């Protein structure tokens, strides 16, 4: 079944025919437009406070616009065609960066100038690798999050199960703990949803499945990938809830105590601790202790399948992109500010999902990592991460930026990563599979 589904996947690379506009924004040097991919209201409000401080310090006015991740390609294409690109695009995942690069919508010289001004050695090596294409610095990396497999440690311990870090252990746990009341595992399966691709890519990388090889040939029909599709299809068909699942239902089922495992990002950590009122855990035990799931959940980050040569972990590096039509000087000034004076406040918006990939300054190489560890997580209630999670979880977060793997980029085929954001062929295949 998986082989048949994989055979239907076609990745159409984004075209590179759109030439950068000659009409830059240099005459608008006191005003820039900034798009963000982070559209959660409280995060937008917090970012606007940082922007206000930037404007007060520099005199540069900023029009701040939120753009949903799943609509990014469409809106970007429309803006480019109309000659109305923003000056800066923030909170951009790697696929978004590559989409812009493939369509020649990026000012790589400006990005390189920012990295040079801040100090190349103040950034994590992996974050720079992921935001480069050969010698070209496509964007300026800012923070990273990791994909995790959350599991009910209390249920695992009671059943004598090993931590779910291998395909075999994940399947064994899903089979042992699946019941009419509790699903063995929940994970995204919705076609057309980037979260579905992120979920599957995490598991696929663990089994040595790559989307493309170094020659640019799509390899989703490889033995490793077919086995990965089979593995995921088996889990979702036999040990999960019925119907399609998305970012909200996966969280809701795990929070209700109706799933033994769930695949989600590090952004789940504050919510699982009961620190966000509109996303509170609802498990029976959570009524008396809202942090019950946080105290009784483990996390697995680096996973490995039977065909994988070494454990792998999916994650995302977010970046600031300076566009080809930008007012270069104020755009660079803005990005530099967001990675210096505004950086700690930026990370504080959601520390559980914003680990600093700029670790410090030339004078204090660990300044930002040290500050990050003291930040409080949560939305409606704030508390240190260490109040709810053991040091091993904190260590997973701090090491995540250096351990991340991604399809296509390490093979020098980053443009196909951007194309996959627009086409989302893998989520379509997952939808057909389950």
Where are the regions that the model predicts?
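Short, low-complexity disordered leader/linker segments with a strong preference
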Residues: 1-33, 56
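Extracytoplasmic "Venus flytrap"/periplasmic binding protein-like
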Residues: 53-123, 154-165, 260-261, 271, ...
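Extracytoplasmic/periplasmic solute-binding protein
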Residues: 134-140, 171-217, 224, 251-252, ...
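C-terminal capping/gating helix-and-loop segments adjacent to ligand/active sites or protein-protein/ligand interfaces
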Residues: 132, 353-356, 373-434
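Extracytoplasmic/periplasmic substrate-recognition and gating elements
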Residues: 159, 238, 277-360
């Amino acid at each position: 079944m998986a082989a048949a589904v994989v055979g239907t996947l076609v990745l159409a690379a984004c075209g590179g025919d759109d030439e950068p506009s000659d009409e830059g924004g240099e005459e608008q040097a006191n005003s820039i437009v900034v798009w963000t991919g982070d559209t959660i209201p409280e995060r937008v409000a917090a970012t606007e406070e940082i922007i206000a401080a930037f404007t007060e310090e520099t005199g540069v006015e900023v029009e701040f616009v939120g753009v949903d991740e799943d609509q990014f390609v469409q809106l970007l294409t429309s803006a480019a065609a109309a000659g109305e690109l923003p000056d800066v695009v923030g909170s951009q995942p790697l696929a978004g960066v590559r989409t812009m690069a493939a369509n020649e919508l990026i000012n790589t010289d400006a990005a390189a100038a920012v990295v040079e001004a801040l100090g190349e050695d103040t950034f994590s090596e992996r974050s720079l690798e992921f935001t480069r294409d050969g010698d070209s610095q496509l964007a300026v990396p800012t923070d990273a999050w990791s994909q995790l497999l959350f599991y009910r440690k209390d249920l695992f311990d009671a059943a004598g199960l090993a931590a779910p870090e291998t395909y075999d252990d994940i399947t064994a746990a899903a089979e042992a703990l699946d019941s009419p009341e509790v699903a063995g595992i929940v994970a995204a399966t919705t076609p057309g949803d980037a979260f579905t691709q992120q979920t599957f890519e995490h598991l696929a990388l663990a089994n040595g499945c790559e989307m493309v090889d170094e020659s640019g040939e799509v390899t989703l029909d490889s033995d490793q990938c077919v086995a990965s599709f089979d593995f995921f299809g088996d889990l979702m068909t036999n040990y999960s809830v019925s119907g399609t699942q998305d970012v909200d239902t996966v969280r809701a089922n795990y929070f209700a105590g109706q799933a033994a495992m769930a695949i989600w990002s590090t952004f789940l950590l504050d919510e699982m601790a009961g620190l966000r009122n509109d996303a509170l855990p609802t498990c029976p035990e959570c009524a008396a202790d809202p942090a019950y799931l946080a105290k009784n959940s483990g996390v697995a980050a680096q996973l490995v399948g039977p065909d994988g040569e070494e454990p792998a972990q999916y994650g995302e590096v977010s970046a600031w992109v300076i566009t080809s039509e930008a007012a270069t000087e104020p755009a660079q000034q803005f990005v530099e500010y967001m990675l210096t004076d505004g950086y700690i406040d930026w990370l504080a918006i959601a520390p559980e999902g914003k680990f600093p990939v700029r670790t410090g300054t030339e004078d204090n190489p660990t300044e930002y990592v040290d500050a990050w560890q003291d930040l409080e997580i949560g939305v409606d209630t704030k508390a240190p991460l260490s109040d709810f999670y053991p040091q091993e979880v904190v260590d997973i977060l701090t090491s995540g930026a250096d351990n991340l793997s991604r399809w296509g980029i390490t093979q020098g085929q980053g443009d196909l990563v951007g194309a996959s954001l627009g086409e989302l062929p893998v989520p379509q295949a997952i939808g057909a599979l389950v």
